């Protein structure tokens, strides 16, 4: 007879009328009982003949592709002019005094950020914009191209001008070496002084003035430079190591654009007169530059190499035959849907190519991309705006994958210990947080996005003209692309983009100037940055609490008036560093803070309402006695795992599901197991904040017996049969908790200390989790454990009771600065201007 839910509850000791714990609990460790229960609940039955279920509620599993929805009315979000101040460390020091080592190290990491992949795979330009929406290919092409253009205009991307130069908009940083008329301009910066512009083969600045060529040779392989391109390193390697910016002006050569050939550049750029950096002059000269003048000094043409004449250098002078778009003007219409009808609407379609305000030198960058892009909804709640998805997954796959640095994410208990208090809270929203952090230009060749131009994009989609790939500029197949579909799409897009259609129909290659979202390094850098900023804020306002996770910043203060004045001060400070906040998204939470999916108040933490709603929905839709595909189980476990710490039995209750996912087998929910989980998740208990205290109850065990020291009382017992040592220690801890009621226990077992009971026999893990919920553990070495003797059957010998203090930990949550205490038992009427006198130090 299958096990009923009531019987199962009784078995797990979740009912009050269970027998004495010392007899009942060891039974749950019995392998035979665990196996029988698993069979009764149909938990481990992988061989099912019924077809698997691949969808449960909103969770989809194997063989199901979620079709993304294209929205023709997507708006491209606006990006403010984000420019993080380069002297951020000095500004912080002026604000709060000397920075700690940790804060300094973190801020140096992102000024500028560096990226060194082991291997970079270059893809053809046609793969620049992914054909994610085949029905709306042209529309998607232009919307994506507009998004990229917006990012370039906002100073977030570089535009590849030639193999060795790029242009960008916005304010330059000191590590971006300026080019004027294909010539380097040296600026002195307060950060590096003159040593920062040692000429190197790759345009990477070395930190030290000594021997940059040696460094550049070391870095060549990581930057993907071939040995023959390091011509500078080769030419100068015979000389002494110390090359300063103004030491040998006569032997100096610049490789700003193309390193090949005998073209020697005039050395006046290195003379001190041209060091003055005049932005206004540069802008005017740029606007009159034609692409013909942008040829390299060595006489090599420097436009895209692998691209047909559609983007050849002469086009901005007005030669029509170089531009695919303008060729239609002089050709006869081929039908009523010929593109020439659209192109003849305008006399002046504007420039073929736009150039940025600044031109800089970059390492050799091929006319390729390293990742594809496409658009999706900004988030599930905002479908009117688009978000750019960049696929740089090549850096986290395969044998040459980059191992991203690990960083600490606060766990639930640490978070609760830290934030559960009676403070008033508000959260700040950093707009486009990732795009605040500047990347070194040396990373550009690895992070390239772009598009091959409309003609090749359309040709790739229509298989007929795919063969004549090499002759796209020629007249005979100019009209191959004319179709009703393309004509109608372009006419509609003309309303939105106007003359820009021409600009967007040209090929372009862009590299990231700020950190992109699709690279594993970015979350790490963002976490380092915001935690350093919060650390500075905490030290500037010692009677408040500031905390961050990624781009989510929260501020807490004793009263609402205090919080408002803190908010004003912190906002002004962040804006002075160049951090853009989104004022519309500032949320005031009162006393219960919503953060990282939790609601955290003085009583502890619980999952947010929308997660509770999802849980209810999940159980409503969960089928019984039907095998569910393991991929769906993975998604169910993702949701249930988030809320597991708030249930009686915690993670151990989900172990059967974990096991089936690991074995990649289907899982069948029996009515009893579903009812058990359902009851677990419909009554959630808050996770409370741990309190400091003295440990006066100790537990210890041997495989055959257990012993407790409760104050001056000693208790011992034996097991019916010998048990594995970890199981015995866990049982002893449960007995100590149930006999004494103490919520701080001393134990010498690391597994019990870790509070992860998923590796124990299933029934025991579930029961122990419930008994030990809310218990804090202190480590006591075996030699000092007062419960050691009773566990070995010796009751007469009394070791002295230790005075073992328990201090709640906030984990590695980057609280390097001392933070104030926020004891919730203080009266609420603390005057808001008075810093509290009790300072709390992280353990």
Curated annotation (Swiss-Prot):
GO terms for molecular function: DNA binding; DNA-directed DNA polymerase activity; metal ion binding; RNA-directed DNA polymerase activity; RNA-DNA hybrid ribonuclease activity. Its EC number is 2.7.7.7, 2.7.7.49, 3.1.26.4. Residues 218-243, 291-315 are annotated as: Disordered. It comes from the Viruses. Residues 357-600 form the Reverse transcriptase domain. Keywords: DNA replication, DNA-binding, DNA-directed DNA polymerase, Endonuclease, Host-virus interaction, Hydrolase, Inhibition of host innate immune response by virus, Inhibition of host RLR pathway by virus, Magnesium, Metal-binding, Multifunctional enzyme, Nuclease, Nucleotidyltransferase, RNA-directed DNA polymerase, Transferase, Viral immunoevasion. Residues 1-177 are annotated as: Terminal protein domain (TP). The keyword Metal-binding applies. Pfam families: DNA_pol_viral_C, DNA_pol_viral_N, RVT_1. PROSITE patterns: RT_POL. The keyword Phosphoprotein does not apply. It catalyses: DNA(n) + a 2'-deoxyribonucleoside 5'-triphosphate = DNA(n+1) + diphosphate; Endonucleolytic cleavage to 5'-phosphomonoester. InterPro entries: DNA/RNA_pol_sf, DNApol_viral_C, DNApol_viral_N, HBV_DPOL, Rev_trsase/Diguanyl_cyclase, RT_dom, Viral_Replic_Matur_Polypro. Mg(2+) binds at residues 429, 551-552. Belongs to the hepadnaviridae P protein family. HAMAP family: HBV_DPOL (MF_04073). Hepadnaviral virions contain probably just one P protein molecule per particle. This is Protein P. It comes from Hepatitis B virus genotype C subtype ayw (isolate Australia/AustRC/1992) (HBV-C). The gene is P.
């Amino acid at each position: 007879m299958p096990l009923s839910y009531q019987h199962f509850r009784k078995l797990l000791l979740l009912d009050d009328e269970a027998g004495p714990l010392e007899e009942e609990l060891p039974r749950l460790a019995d392998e035979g009982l665990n196996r029988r229960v698993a069979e009764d609940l149909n938990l481990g039955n992988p061989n099912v003949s019924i077809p698997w279920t691949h969808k449960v509620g909103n969770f989809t599993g194997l063989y199901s592709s979620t079709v993304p929805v294209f929205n023709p009315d997507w708006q491209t979000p606006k990006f403010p002019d984000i420019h993080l101040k380069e002297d951020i460390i000095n500004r912080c020091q002026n604000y709060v005094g000397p920075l700690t080592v940790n804060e300094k190290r973190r801020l140096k990491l992102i000024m500028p950020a560096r990226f060194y992949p082991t291997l970079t795979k270059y893809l053809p330009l046609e793969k620049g914009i992914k054909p994610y929406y085949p029905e709306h290919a042209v529309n998607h092409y232009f919307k994506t191209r507009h998004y990229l253009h917006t990012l370039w205009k906002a100073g977030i991307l570089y535009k590849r001008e030639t193999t060795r130069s790029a242009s960008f908009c916005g304010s330059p940083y000191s590590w971006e070496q300026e080019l004027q008329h294909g010539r380097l301009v040296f600026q002195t910066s307060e950060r590096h002084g003159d040593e920062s512009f040692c000429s190197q083969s790759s345009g990477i600045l070395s930190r030290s003035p000594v021997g940059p060529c040696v460094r550049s040779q070391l870095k060549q392989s990581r930057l993907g430079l071939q040995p023959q391109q390091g011509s500078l390193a080769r030419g100068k390697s015979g000389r002494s190591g110390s090359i300063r910016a103004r030491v040998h002006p006569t032997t100096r050569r610049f490789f700003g654009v193309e390193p090949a050939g005998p073209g020697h550049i005039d050395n006046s750029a290195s003379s001190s007169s041209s060091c003055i950096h005049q932005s206004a002059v540069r802008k005017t000269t740029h606007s009159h530059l034609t692409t013909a003048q942008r040829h390299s000094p060595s006489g090599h043409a420097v436009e895209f190499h692998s691209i047909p004449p559609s983007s050849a250098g002469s086009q901005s002078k007005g030669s029509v035959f170089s531009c695919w778009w303008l060729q239609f003007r002089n050709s006869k219409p081929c039908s009523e849907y010929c593109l020439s009808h659209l192109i003849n609407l305008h006399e002046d379609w504007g420039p073929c190519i736009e150039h940025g305000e600044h031109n800089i030198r970059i390492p050799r960058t091929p006319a390729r991309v390293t990742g594809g892009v496409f658009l999706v909804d900004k988030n599930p709640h905002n479908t009117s705006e688009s978000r750019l998805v960049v696929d740089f997954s090549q850096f986290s796959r395969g044998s040459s994958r980059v191992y991203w640095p690990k960083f600490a994410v606060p766990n639930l208990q640490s978070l609760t210990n830290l934030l559960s208090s009676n403070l008033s809270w508000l959260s700040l929203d950093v707009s486009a947080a990732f795009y605040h952090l500047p990347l070194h230009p040396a990373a550009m060749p690895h992070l390239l996005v772009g598009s091959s131009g409309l003609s090749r994009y359309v040709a790739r989609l229509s298989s007929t003209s795919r063969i004549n790939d090499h002759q796209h500029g020629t007249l005979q197949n100019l009209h191959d692309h004319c179709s009703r579909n393309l004509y109608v799409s372009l006419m509609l897009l003309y309303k939105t983009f106007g003359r820009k259609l021409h600009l967007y129909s040209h090929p372009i290659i862009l590299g990231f100037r700020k950190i992109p979202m699709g690279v594993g390094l970015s979350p790490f850098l963002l976490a380092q940055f915001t935690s350093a900023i919060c650390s500075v804020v905490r030290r500037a306002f010692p009677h408040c609490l500031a905390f961050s996770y990624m781009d989510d910043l929260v501020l807490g203060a004793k009263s609402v008036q205090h919080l408002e004045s803190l908010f004003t001060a912190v906002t002004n400070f962040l804006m002075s560093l160049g951090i853009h906040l989104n004022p519309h998204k500032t949320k005031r939470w009162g006393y219960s803070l919503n953060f990282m999916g939790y609601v955290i108040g003085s009583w502890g933490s619980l999952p947010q309402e929308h997660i509770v709603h999802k849980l209810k929905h999940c159980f409503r839709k969960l089928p019984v006695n039907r095998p569910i595909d393991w991929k769906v189980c993975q998604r169910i476990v993702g949701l249930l795992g988030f809320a597991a710490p708030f249930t009686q039995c915690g993670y151990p209750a989900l172990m059967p599901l974990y096991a089936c996912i690991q074995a990649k087998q289907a899982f069948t929910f029996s009515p009893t197991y579903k009812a058990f989980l359902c009851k677990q998740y419909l009554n959630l208990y808050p996770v409370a904040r741990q309190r400091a205290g003295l440990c006066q109850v100790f537990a210890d065990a041997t495989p055959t017996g257990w012993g407790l020291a409760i104050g001056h009382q000693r208790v011992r017992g034996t097991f019916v049969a010998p048990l594995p040592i970890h199981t015995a220690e866990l049982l002893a801890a449960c007995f100590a908790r149930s006999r004494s009621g103490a919520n701080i226990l001393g134990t010498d077992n690391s597994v019990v200390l870790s509070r992860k009971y998923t590796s124990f026999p299933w029934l025991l893990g579930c029961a122990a989790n419930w008994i030990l919920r809310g218990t804090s553990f202190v480590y006591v070495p075996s030699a000092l454990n007062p419960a050691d003797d009773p566990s070995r059957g010796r009751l007469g010998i009394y070791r002295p009771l230790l005075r073992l203090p328990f201090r709640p930990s906030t984990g590695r949550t980057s609280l390097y600065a001392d933070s104030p205490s926020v004891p919730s038992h203080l009266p609420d009427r603390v005057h808001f201007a008075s810093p509290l006198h009790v300072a709390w130090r992280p353990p």
